[in-house]
Amino acid sequence: MPLLVCGINHQSAPLTVREKLVFTPERTPLALQSLLAEKAVNEALLLSTCNRTEIYTTVDEAATILRWLSKQPQLSGIDLRSFCYARRDIEMVRHVMRVGSGLDSMVLGEPQILGQMKQAYLLARRIGAVGSELGRLFPAVFAATKRIRSETAIGANPVSIAYAVVQLAKRIFSHLNQCQILLIGAGETIELVFSHLYNQGARHFFIANRTLTRAKQIAEPYHAQAIRLSDIPTYLPKVDIVISATMSQLPLVGKGAVESALRQRKRRPLFMADLALPRDIEPETAQLEDVYLYNIDDLQTLIAQNRQTREAAAKQAEAMVEMQAIHYMRQLQVHKAGDTIRRFRERVEMLRDQELEKALAHFQRTNDPKAVIAHFAHNLTNKILHQPTTKLRQAAYEDQVQLLLSAKELFDL
């Protein structure tokens, strides 16, 4: 059965396209069920992050997946063929291992993607979208990725989008301990941002989230204040830094609210980072004077500088990915050969049982056991060799040289 990945990422599609092709954890189960309803789609796994949306499946044609993606209502008017890529078989295996290892990430070697991939796998398996092929592939990918990360320095000197944002904020505000900071969201990205900011000396935080209880869980260890999303306009005039990363389908911070906050701040600068997809902060906010608004794509330049520390490790990791991908495909061939071996063994055992039954019946009618055994051996040998002999003669007649050579190797002749 073929292996296929089809999708878009930060290299193939701009933010304006990527943000329209985001599947939240709440939407993913229904999306997978819809995909499995498509003809020829028997297995599927959907990975959707701020930098990529990829579908891993077992169909022959990428066009099947493209057609399904194009049916998504949010993509009306967008020709995905200009942005999508497809990888098959060993190229697909190589790609998945590169993604899981962080080699294909905007931030080289970032570890979050592996956790996101594992969650996507568990979700797909839970709803029955993972069959034998993907069920064999992804545990192998996770094992290979673990080995790559432990045997190379690809994860050394941690850098991430969260870390890059903090570096960028320090260019505007060199003394983070004097800044009031508003973090919007309560997911892994915000937790990482929170941790990096705190480690850099920041101490004054407000955490806004749709669920106040979740905001309090994140805020309490840092003695921060949890607020509701509806309170954001009230707190905007008080803060110097705003960093947002939610799964909201609509903007949470509008240009008007920021404009009002700036008037109350008496034009003091406001650093804003929108790490969400779709975006949490209206893009037009960047037009306001004294606002420094950055989105995910804006971070690429800074992240490119950080990549240099991991380039040597990346070369080693790439070599390991290649080795692991080849190993997996060879193991897959061995597994497929196992079915052939099993059927061959079953056939020979059937012939043996048939001849053994005849021999046992013959024992009842003769006093010469040696003759019975000789007859049994002769008949069994003929039955086993009949089909291969016929095929070899046919191959010789049709000048199938390669088949004859393979037979010599197979039977050690």
From Swiss-Prot:
Catalysis performed (reactions): (S)-4-amino-5-oxopentanoate + tRNA(Glu) + NADP(+) = L-glutamyl-tRNA(Glu) + NADPH + H(+)
Q: Where is this site: Important for activity?
A: H95
Tell me which residues bind substrate: T49, C50, N51, R52, S105, E110, P111, Q112, Q116
Question: What's the protein name?
Answer: Glutamyl-tRNA reductase
> Member of which family?
Belongs to the glutamyl-tRNA reductase family.
Please, what other remarks does the record include?
Answer: During catalysis, the active site Cys acts as a nucleophile attacking the alpha-carbonyl group of tRNA-bound glutamate with the formation of a thioester intermediate between enzyme and glutamate, and the concomitant release of tRNA(Glu). The thioester intermediate is finally reduced by direct hydride transfer from NADPH, to form the product GSA.
Superkingdom field: Bacteria
* Gene field: hemA
Q: What is its EC number?
A: 1.2.1.70
Q: Tell me which InterPro entries the record gives.
A: 4pyrrol_synth_GluRdtase, 4pyrrol_synth_GluRdtase_dimer, 4pyrrol_synth_GluRdtase_N, GluRdtase_CS, GluRdtase_dimer_dom_sf, GluRdtase_N_sf, NAD(P)-bd_dom_sf, Shikm_DH/Glu-tRNA_Rdtase
State one molecular function term (GO). glutamyl-tRNA reductase activity
